[in-house]
């Protein structure tokens, strides 16, 4: 009955859902619209230096092509969905135009594109690559093969923790969001965000892949994979980070970084020629 309702009647089934609808909707910030993060604005860090912006794309020849614009703070691990788009049976030109639009609006550091079969042509598109290269934006492929094909079931499901947990309301005994989400969604007034929320709350590993509506969920998953890499790398201990047990707090404070180019320029200026 659950599978029938989700696939053939396209109904949201809340019982034992992978993504709890209470948590997903509780992660939506009514005070944040879609668009780029603004330093110091609501729910945005004051210093944007540690924020990394990316866009995941799940392209398709037939059906929908999903775009998810995503940001992660490499220091705090906080995530934001900035916007989501989907195109129905798009032409290569329409996909190219949407990539250019996202690049101009959000200035992402990179695009992550599923690159199996037809999708590989998108990664190799010369016009797209020239446009992105002129703006310093990377285009990275995501390959689905025999070693990671279970990402669709286990990997996607692992994102459920990003939306936080529920607690029981003391008044009406109903589950409410605990406010502990790591991922923030903007208010769902746009078609892309609405569809992303619908795909999340109805997503189930029990439904065969060919019947799932998951274009935006997969584009979100590509971004989250990259976000985990960035957060893990930022927390890795570095030699210059003051992790030595033999350094006192005063010694750590007295250390600083120098620019070797500035030192070389200063030495060049002080050099006396005879």
What are these language model-derived features?
Residues 1-57:
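ATPase catalytic-site recognition across NTP-hydrolyzing enzymes
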Residues 69-203, 264-274:
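Mg2+-dependent endonuclease catalytic cores in nucleic-acid-processing enzymes, primarily RNase H-like
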Residues 3-7, 198-240:
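P-loop NTPase motor core of the ASCE superfamily
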Residues 55-65:
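Short acidic, Gly/Ser-rich segments with clustered Asp/Glu that frequently serve as metal-coordination loops
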Residues 10, 105, 161-169, 222-232:
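Short, well-ordered loop/turn and helix-capping segments at boundaries between secondary-structure elements
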Residues 17-27, 223-274:
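Acidic two-metal-ion nuclease catalytic site recognized across multiple nuclease folds
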Residues 2-12, 18-25, 114, 173-177, ...:
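Short coil/turn segments at secondary-structure boundaries
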Residues 12, 59-61, 117:
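Short, flexible loop/turn elements at secondary-structure junctions
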């Amino acid at each position: 009955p659950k599978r029938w309702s989700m696939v053939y009647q396209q109904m949201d089934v809340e019982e034992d859902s992978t993504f709890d609808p209470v948590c997903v909707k509780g992660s939506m910030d009514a005070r944040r619209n879609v668009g780029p993060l603004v330093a110091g604005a609501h729910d945005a860090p004051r210093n944007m230096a540690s924020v990394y912006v990316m866009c995941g794309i799940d392209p398709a020849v037939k059906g929908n092509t999903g775009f998810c614009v995503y940001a992660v703070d490499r220091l705090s691990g906080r995530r934001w969905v900035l916007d989501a788009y989907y195109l129905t049976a798009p032409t290569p030109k329409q996909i190219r135009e949407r990539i250019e639009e996202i690049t101009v609006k959000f200035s992402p550091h990179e695009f992550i594109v599923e690159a199996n079969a037809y999708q590989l042509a998108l990664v190799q598109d010369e016009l797209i690559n020239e446009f992105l290269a002129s703006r310093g934006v990377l285009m990275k492929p995501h390959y689905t093969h025999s070693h990671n094909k279970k990402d669709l079931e286990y990997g996607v499901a692992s994102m459920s923790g990003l939306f936080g947990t529920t607690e029981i309301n003391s008044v009406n005994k109903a589950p409410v969001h605990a406010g502990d989400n790591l991922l923030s969604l903007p208010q769902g007034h746009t078609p892309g965000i609405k569809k992303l929320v619908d795909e999340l709350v109805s997503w189930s590993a029990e439904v065969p892949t060919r019947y799932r509506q998951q274009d935006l969920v997969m584009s979100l998953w590509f971004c989250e994979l990259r976000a985990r890499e960035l957060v893990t790398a930022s927390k890795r201990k570095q030699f210059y980070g003051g992790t030595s047990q033999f350094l006192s707090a005063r010694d750590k404070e007295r250390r600083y970084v120098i620019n070797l180019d500035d030192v070389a320029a200063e030495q060049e200026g002080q050099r006396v020629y005879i």
